[in-house]
Amino acid sequence: MVFMANKKKTKGKKTRRPTKAEIERQRAIQRMITALVLTIILFFGIIRLGIFGITVYNVIRFMVGSLAYLFIAATLIYLYFFKWLRKKDSLVAGFLIASLGLLIEWHAYLFSMPILKDKEILRSTARLIVSDLMQFKITVFAGGGMLGALIYKPIAFLFSNIGAYMIGVLFIILGLFLMSSLEVYDIVEFIRAFKNKVAEKHEQNKKERFAKREMKKAIAEQERIERQKAEEEAYLASVNVDPETGEILEDQAEDNLDDALPPEVSETSTPVFEPEILAYETSPQNDPLPVEPTIYLEDYDSPIPNMRENDEEMVYDLDDDVDDSDIENVDFTPKTTLVYKLPTIDLFAPDKPKNQSKEKDLVRKNIRVLEETFRSFGIDVKVERAEIGPSVTKYEIKPAVGVRVNRISNLSDDLALALAAKDVRIETPIPGKSLIGIEVPNSEIATVSFRELWEQSDANPENLLEVPLGKAVNGNARSFNLARMPHLLVAGSTGSGKSVAVNGIISSILMKARPDQVKFMMIDPKMVELSVYNDIPHLLIPVVTNPRKASKALQKVVDEMENRYELFSKIGVRNIAGYNTKVEEFNASSEQKQIPLPLIVVIVDELADLMMVASKEVEDAIIRLGQKARAAGIHMILATQRPSVDVISGLIKANVPSRIAFAVSSGTDSRTILDENGAEKLLGRGDMLFKPIDENHPVRLQGSFISDDDVERIVGFIKDQAEADYDDAFDPGEVSETDNGSGGGGGVPESDPLFEEAKGLVLETQKASASMIQRRLSVGFNRATRLMEELEAAGVIGPAEGTKPRKVLMTPTPSE
């Protein structure tokens, strides 16, 4: 029994080990199931179906970025062609190397985008993709994902972003070379064969062109011979001899010759018509202005090209006993001559090349569409001309006799539908032509740089306030002279290009004018647009950002205008040009050098904000300046993004006749600015309608673009030459928070710190004149005038009596 029990225990049942074929079959089934499951998951990721599909796609994007589709396709191919790919080592290696090159290229492109502020590569890449992953969205470009970031980071550190581009291209070329399994010799032979084929094709085309040219010459020569033969035969057939004199009758022969001419040379034959298409890049351009700096002396008007910077300073030694002349209230303060260089155009970034060649094909297509659309409405028109501008293309059409103009203008929406355009503006008619203009937006807007516009502008450099504004549809630069406007209203919605246009106008004036020729008063309630110009020598006072101070600052300008008119009256001139001419004549005949009055440009960047704080005072100041400031050399530029009637009132419009309208939201706003519709159809980004004082219809222009870097460069150039010299007479002073501007704007401070000194000087000399106060106290003309007014208000001196000197009403006391 024991033996049997032991035997039973040792004789256990053995398990059969699976065969090799069974193991391989099980692995094949596992691979098939895995491939099927992964295929389903990747399919949801490809079509991004639901939250699951988007999550799958974002997980793959986290790894390989925008190469997610390539990764999915490669994974599926590997799953189903595993055995075949094991035998293709060079193909797999080439694909992996090319994929690494693509990852580097995509990531280099990602970090060349200006919107990517954070340059920490791994952190920035993770933040971009994780934000989409958490929100179940696919919104941003992911570059090469985290794998691309890991590869790109050391390459960019060692070789920069451009070097990463080059290395990525090398990886792609190497990968394709390995995938193709070609030898170097095969590639060289292919390149040589391709080069020979191109050379043969070029030689064949050259021979064909030569043969065609010779054939045309032969045909033209044959036609000339036949035409000459026909003329001779007609002449011989028409010869008529006078029986009495035996002379040939020439007149009759010429008449018969005209009748015998073949129809192809008849003068009345009608040529085949084809509309003329003028491209923006081929439009006429003026020669660029020279960029060599011109050096000026502050006390002279004429340029001195060869001034040495180490010249001796010129200081005028004036005699206190100089008699007052007709030019009495002028600045005789000795001044140190400043060498000042005007900025040059090379401070601005060069413009990028523009290519609108593809617009020509679109224009030819639109010409046919326009004619067919008008024909479908029963209107017979012919497109005479098409001009491709920077932002729009203008089609000039000529309607048939009897077609009413309003029938064409009423079809703007139908034309926009037929042309698939954003909007269509119809100009009926074009000023000076018997044609109608149809303006259609281009597929791409060509940016007009400030440097390009300046170089092509024909503005007179002697006119300090003549500045280039933009380019018309025909590509010609358009300038305007602010002195003739004489004030300018700039209005449009947010982001339409107002501030860029104002910066362009300011920069243009700074390019031409010295600090003693033009002065600015800038009012910027937004505090960010004009603050860059602080501390330039052209400013009268720092940029005003407080709306309550702005109304007082405008009142100071009004006071300056009145003072200038009083000065003109004493001198006997009508405007600032006449006064400065008198100054030049005085300087030529006298050792005392007098400074001419500068032009003043008042710039308000946001009028609506001022009208909300002190509408009555601001409106009164603007109206007074608009009515009288032109002759005094004071000009205004008013900008607003809210062109409503409560901001641009009727009185302001009546006194600011020149307007610029940028894109607005409605025809009502357009009528508020221009008194007509049109601005609601503009495209934005500098597209404007310019209506100067001397034109009845607005002109469409593409304004120039000037970047913040360009503005900072020109401002830095000016600041390096001279410091700001602010005029206290224009300082609006301090305002309290409760001051609502009801006082009509700031007046003269109660007492000048030099009042007592000026009073003692007048009582001591028993003479009172602004020129004497200027000489003795070393102050400017404006401050001396204020001191004279305070002395008059205090009863020290009498009122002005024309050209007679003022009477001193007080006598000095022993204590004085």
UniProtKB/Swiss-Prot annotation:
Segments for region (Disordered): 1-20, 726-752
SUPFAM superfamilies in alphabetical order: P-loop containing nucleoside triphosphate hydrolases, Winged helix' DNA-binding domain
Composition bias, Acidic residues: 726-737
Start-end of Basic residues biased regions: 1-18
Keyword Cell division annotated: yes
Superkingdom of the organism of origin: Bacteria
UniProt-listed InterPro entries: AAA+_ATPase (IPR003593), FtsK/SpoIIIE/SftA (IPR050206), FtsK_alpha (IPR041027), FtsK_dom (IPR002543), Ftsk_gamma (IPR018541), P-loop_NTPase (IPR027417), WH-like_DNA-bd_sf (IPR036388), WH_DNA-bd_sf (IPR036390)
UniProt-annotated location(s): Cell membrane
Role played: Essential cell division protein that coordinates cell division and chromosome segregation. The N-terminus is involved in assembly of the cell-division machinery. The C-terminus functions as a DNA motor that moves dsDNA in an ATP-dependent manner towards the difSL recombination site, which is located within the replication terminus region. Required for activation of the XerS recombinase, allowing activation of chromosome unlinking by recombination.
Protein name according to UniProt: DNA translocase FtsK
Species for this entry: Streptococcus agalactiae serotype V (strain ATCC BAA-611 / 2603 V/R)
Lineage of producing organism: Bacteria, Bacillati, Bacillota, Bacilli, Lactobacillales
Record gene name: ftsK
